[in-house]
Amino acid sequence: MRYSVLTQQINRSLNNNPGEWDRLFVGKVRVAALNIARLQPHMRDLSIDPTLLKADIIHLCETWVCQDQESTARFELEGYTAHFINVGNGRGIATYSRGDFHHQQDVKEDDFQITKFSNGTLDSIHIYR
């Protein structure tokens, strides 16, 4: 399916009555979390999703990106800084942040992964187990 056709279909299915998520408020933070169930086949979906792209920080789990993957450059998302904890099949997390959010700390184990981002007044911690 062509990119423009897919985008039109997504926009057509959006609610015409915007909620809090859709309104821009100064001083508000939008945090999204999603089990992506393999990042590679869903990267394009992520890059054109108008709802997710309103988030200031996007936490994804079950990325399935291997530690020895040649590069995470193909998983970059325009307008966001990407951070990955690569563990392999069925595991791993990715965080896309923008604005004042910056990576602070990671915990990486085979059976769980944790990452922490902060904007100075708010910490966003993503735990996948």
Which residues does each PLM region occupy?
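A shared catalytic/ligand-binding motif for oxyanion handling
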Residues: 1-129
